[in-house]
Amino acid sequence: MTWSADILTLYPEMFPGPLDKSLSGKALEKGIWNLNIFDLKDYGLGPHKSVDEKPSGGGPGMVLRADVLDSAINDCFKKDRPMIYFSPKGKPLDQEMIERFSVINGVSIICGHFEGIDQRIIDMHDIEEISVGDYILSGGEIATIVFLDSLVRLLPNVLGNGDSKKIESFTDGLLEYPQYTKPNEFKGLKIPDILLSGNHKAIKEWQENQSLSLTKLRRPDLITKKKDKI
């Protein structure tokens, strides 16, 4: 079965966007995955197709209405796949989570806006809240593109070299080692001699040491996380 993403958004024109380029675009063209876009405004109320209201209890901004979202979800989304909503309150997105979603038949995604969506919709439909980082975006579309770009490359027959995804950052819980290519010397900077030695055992050891050192320096939290899994 082809992996597919069903997306509910106020801005359907934002898709596929960059997802029709590079690896994800080629995979989309080949039918390795499908992208289905639904316009939330089609389910809006009244002559102005209203989809939001002021927050109950007061506060700034607007909240996407539960009745509008429920109608759209029931009409657009399949019952047999998980629903995702990107929110700063969600669980942090990581490689392990991406891999979990890549081995099922697809996901349904709600792109939020304004102050978010009515909590009752999250509770009623058992929606998984996910955060792409400790910062605020204008809407869920950009987060959705980040999520899908990362996921699609894990699908079968997307990457040309099957070993590529095995050695990337986060795949083994660490950051990837530095990469070099020709010319061997550039503006006085040389490729490390070990990488040109042909000694595969020594090269692998160098790569592992570099990976560990970089992770300790830039993402020590990953070291702790890796130890906790052992």
What are these regions (language model features)?
Residues 2-42:
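Glycine-rich, flexible N-terminal cofactor/catalytic loop recognition
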Residues 6-8, 36-38, 82-84, 107-109, ...:
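Hydrophobic/aromatic beta-strand patches that form the interior of the parallel beta-sheet core
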Residues 41-46, 136-139:
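A short acidic, often aromatic-flanked loop/helix-cap motif at beta-alpha or helix-coil junctions
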Residues 44-47, 52, 56-69, 77:
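A short aromatic-anchored loop/beta-hairpin motif
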Residues 59, 112, 199:
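Conserved RecA-like P-loop NTPase ATPase core
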Residues 63-113, 118:
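S-adenosyl-L-methionine/SAH cofactor-binding core of RNA-modifying enzymes
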Residues 117, 121-170:
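Structured adenosyl-cofactor binding patch, chiefly the S-adenosyl-L-methionine
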Residues 170-226:
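Long, charged alpha-helical interface segments
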